[in-house]
Amino acid sequence: MIRTLNIAHRGFSGMYPENTMEAFKKAVEIGSDGIETDLHITKDGVIVICHDETIDRTTDGSGFIKDYTYRELTEFNAGHGEKIPSLDELMDYMKDKNLLLNLELKNDVIPYENLERSTIDKIYEYGLKKNVIVSSFNHNSMQKVKKYDSSIKTGLLYGSPIHNPGEYAKRIGADALHPLFSLVMDKATINDIKRNGILINVYTVNEKSYMKKLIDLGVDGIITNYPNLLKDVIEKLTDK
């Protein structure tokens, strides 16, 4: 039985405009176990979904998210006629799905005030606490989340090696590590992390050979732009 979760990175972003409702809905339709997405705050305090601090790469507009109101942001095309969604839109869609929702707080470049508290309030509002894991490259932010509510699951993102990652996560008080997948391609590292009771959700895995290897190693979740490919890998391994 394969227990590795299939987590759609920015939705089904390999085929549809990333971090749009279209990408999220397509990920759910093809059978993903969860969605990973990215949160920023607008000038008027609305939590919105976008990977970058600016809208230049993903829309037909330009400038920093923090300098726009939410209404102003909705004027831009994020691909296929889609708009930049609010967290409310995504949570309203996900509230009855019983799927994982990985909310990455994008506060490692711009230290948005109250992003942690505002995100937690939305988790409560939509009754999604048991479905959500909050992650960030800003590990101090994850400690702040735990201070607000120790029962909310947190994941530490990292793209370069951490000494004794399992012990580090335990010391920080996190539930999971979210490493760049190439950092945990050996059984010893996986075992060390799991020995400390820490979950491992790796990013961003888009090739079937790596997906299979990581499943064999026992990671808990794989974050991918192509949840359709990962679904195929999991089904083939399950059929063996």
Where is each model-derived feature located?
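Phosphate-group recognition and catalysis centered on beta-loop-alpha active-site segments
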Residues: 1-240
